[in-house]
Amino acid sequence: MRKRALLAATVAVASAVLTGVTAAPAAHAATGNSLSVFAWNVDLGTSIVDSTENENAAGRTPVVEQIIQQHNADVVVLDELFNHSSTSSIESALAAQYPYHTPVVGQVCSGGGWNGISGDCSNSWFVINGGTMIFSKYPIKAQYAHVFSNSTSGTWDYNANKGAALAEIDKNGVNTWVVGTHLQADQSGTSTDTTQSTRLAQLGEIQGWVNGIVGSSAPVLIGGDLNVEYFHGASRGDYANAQNAVGGVLGTPATDPSQLTTMDCPVSAWCQYMGGVESFPTNYQDSLDYVGYLNAPGRPTPLALPSVVTDFDPQAGWTAGQLDTQSPSDHYPVQATFQLP
């Protein structure tokens, strides 16, 4: 989300008409040397935000759980897990299908089940966690957290331990690393050039951090809410610059006109509601969420960048042109299946 950290940190001290889009089918478990990745900003603010802004986390969380379960990806990256009750519920609900998961990035600054924590992690009572977590059907052999050193001063992200999780997944003896992350958000009163510069610096942090841990040993996939505007940022070169900064290939549903944008307020009733809460346009449309892979000398990569789809799960009886009143988040999930060497 563009401004979730604004509200979360503050309380710590649905234009275009959709036509011809149908719900994406649930992914089947990948077979052979493949790994499917599902990434979603689930928009679950802190308990105080939830109460003061009437965000109904208790009602939305079971829908989040249901959507994750039905898409059945091998690995799930979640962002904006700021609500501790929702996080505990999701862990419990997914336990049978996803018995392995990392902790939430930035919840603690040492120990906590991580093999290592790096970056600028704060233990201050005025700083919230980073909200990012990885779930897996398959064993996680190692897990690392990095809290970004680069953050835009004067924005609410500055008061969050946002960063990235890195998990080594062992699927039937084939090891693949997965990065889950949530980059700097835009904020009213701060230049987008400034926040985009921070995002590029954060992607550079990810590249250096991952290279230092993984080297060329195995493929590295990445997913999450990068807050990189595929459409609105085209004139700035945001997408190309993001790929260059992270040293990788970022897949997006934005290249397929039949797909929803990952933040699609004209379609999503919840996106419209959150526009009113967070002061972004209630007709906002852009793709901010990506899945892809990272390059490094000698490192194996997927055979090709797969098609990335926006998972769309509207209410029963939905037809094109109606608002989606089922979505529990202002973002739609993205998903892809990677064929690995």
Label for each model-derived stretch:
Residues 2-11, 17, 21-96, 106-119, ...:
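N-terminal, active-site-proximal structural segment of metallo-dependent hydrolase catalytic domains
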Residues 37-42, 64-87, 135, 167, ...:
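Active-site beta-strand/loop signature of hydrolases that rely on acidic residues for catalysis
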Residues 45-48, 84-87, 109-113, 131, ...:
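Short catalytic/ligand-binding loop motif for oxyanion handling, primarily in non-cytosolic enzymes
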Residues 59-70, 85, 89, 130, ...:
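Extracytoplasmic/secreted proteins, especially bacterial periplasmic and envelope-associated proteins
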Residues 81-184:
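Structured beta-strand-rich core segments of catalytic domains in phosphoester-bond hydrolases
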Residues 211-221, 228-341:
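Metal-dependent phosphoester-hydrolase catalytic domains
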